[in-house]
C-alpha cells in the first residue's frame, strides 16, 4: 500500500500482515463495540509483527498495542484465535493470542502455522552479524560462525512448526482447513447457548456503525 503508514512520510510503503497505527486503533474500537454488544470474537491471524523503528515509536504503536490488549482483556466476551499462517512477536498476542489475555477460549493452528518471536534468519543476523564483520576484518575463519548461524536458523525453524506449536501449547489443536468452519460454528454456538449476558439486537451499536461506514464509503 503506497504512502502508508502516513507517519513514515513520503515514499512509505505499507507491508501486508504488518500492524500499523490505523489498524491498531480500528481493532481497538471494534473490540470495544463487540464487548458492548456482547458479540463473541474470532481472530484470524497472519501477521509479521507490529511496525518498529523511530517513526513507529513516535506514533505510539506500543501504547496502542497495550491498549488493544487492555480492551480484549476487559471485553468479557469469549474469543478464539486461529493462526492461519504467521504469528510473529507482539502482534501474535495482541491479536487475541492466548499469551496476552484471559478471554481466549482456545487457539487453533493450520498446517502452515508458524509462531515465533522472529524468523531464524533475522535472529541469526542479529546475534552474529557483528561477529562476522569483526572476524572478517581480523582475517579469522568465519565458517564456524556461519555454522552457528545455520544451527540457530534450523532451531528456530524446528520450534515454530505446527507440530511443535501444538506440543508446546502455543495452539490447542492443529486443524485441517476444510474442518475449520465446524470449529468456529461450535465455538459461536457455545458462546450463545451460555452467555454471561446478552444485548438485544435493537440496542446493538455495531450493526449500525458498520452500516453507516458502508454508506459513507459509497457516498
PLM regions: where:
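Ligand-binding clefts of soluble mixed alpha/beta catalytic domains
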Residues: 1-219
